[in-house]
Amino acid sequence: MARQYRSDRLSQEIEKEVSDILRRRVRDPRVEGVTITGVDVTGDLQQAKIYYSILSDKASDDQKTKAGLEKASGLIRKELGSRLSIYKTPELSFIRDESVQYGDKIDQLLNKLNRD
């Protein structure tokens, strides 16, 4: 129970800090407009999956954003290490959150049904 509580709190802290780091420290234009939607940290606190969304639906924009995030992951991890008081900073992996596009698609279908 305590271990789960700690990983949940760390997930929330990482989400907040990564959003701030992307907004203030990362200068790469490929990661502009990225929104961090969630973070999952493993029970041993060694790995963190960071879920993000972007406004564009284009595959090329997704690839550019993913490449920008992967390139900036070293800086992000270093900044996290200095901001968080934990023994070892988790390894970061970035995964696109598809739920935003799915929700948008559902919304469009509902609007279409209401018009008909």
UniProtKB/Swiss-Prot annotation:
Belongs to the RbfA family. It comes from the Bacteria. InterPro entries: KH_dom-like_a/b, RbfA, RbfA_dom_sf, Ribosome-bd_factorA_CS. One of several proteins that assist in the late maturation steps of the functional core of the 30S ribosomal subunit. Associates with free 30S ribosomal subunits (but not with 30S subunits that are part of 70S ribosomes or polysomes). Required for efficient processing of 16S rRNA. May interact with the 5'-terminal helix region of 16S rRNA. GO terms for biological process: maturation of SSU-rRNA. GO terms for molecular function: ribosomal small subunit binding. This is Ribosome-binding factor A. It comes from Pediococcus pentosaceus (strain ATCC 25745 / CCUG 21536 / LMG 10740 / 183-1w). It holds the Pfam family RBFA. The gene is rbfA. Its main location: cytoplasm. Monomer. Binds 30S ribosomal subunits, but not 50S ribosomal subunits or 70S ribosomes. Keywords: Cytoplasm, Ribosome biogenesis. GO terms for cellular component: cytosol. It is found in: Cytoplasm. PROSITE patterns: RBFA.
